[in-house]
Amino acid sequence: MATRRQFLKDGALTAGSLLISHPLLFAAGEKKSRKLTILHTNDVHSRLDPFPDGQYAGKGGVAARAKLINEIRAAEENVLLLDAGDIFQGTPYFNLYKGEPEMKAMSMMGYDAGTIGNHDFDGGIENLAEKISAYANFPFIISNYDFTGEPMETHYQPYKVINKGGLTIGITGVGIELTGLVGQGLYGKTKYLDPVQEATRVADFLKKKKNCDMVICLSHLGDKYADNKISDELLAQRSRHIDLIISAHTHRFFESPRSYRNADQDEVIVNQVGWAGIQLGRLDYVFEKGNVKKLDKNKSILVGKNS
């Protein structure tokens, strides 16, 4: 398992090296384009069942989400399934079982990676580490929390590289400042590091050292704020080498993905799908010969009755 300490060591070994151009993704005779489908959730908040009544009656629930995911996987060759945090808290399931059924459900659905939201500490940092260790068969990725000396120290990674159909996809993650938001007793001595600096450091490593064709950041910062508080909007604008930010925390249902320009004037896409598993985000990327990628299609799919 890659730890933040190992990442920093690897980064030090490569520091100062010349930037080399990325090799062409497609060799002669291969297909001219490839497709990657990214499915994503955020702020599900222990909503394992559909809403029983009210505005979202019949919507959400892990059974309906799993059905949609399986249908998309049957139709598409290269699919990633990601979550941007706040898996826990919000229903009696968490009050009674402290995250066990949520982790089991996500593992059964085949999530490729997730990050950590502030409410994932609501049972305490030891509980979070225990539930990940016992029930999650996918990695939790976060680059700006230093868990040294805490139970989470061996249960997270600063990045993950996934190969899909000849594409090399790098994934990192960032979390929100916990001080003032979460009781200190719940997160212990976890240190919060600058998310823009850490995400950029890891993204640079993934693009230059790991030769990733795309870098995705799972973010629990929140999409944007009225003041200058760090957000996904500012992360997109100030970072380098991140292509896509899966947003969370602010529970916003985006009508469509947002497009920003980063510090190098390259495009960064940001998307968020509300909360409670009411929607499943879908982003379809096409990679052309020469490693040119574009967001081809997007859809926020309503989960539940009639979905």
Give the label of every model feature segment.
Residues A2-G304:
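Acidic, metal/ion-coordinating pockets
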Residues S307:
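Polyanionic/metal-chelating signatures
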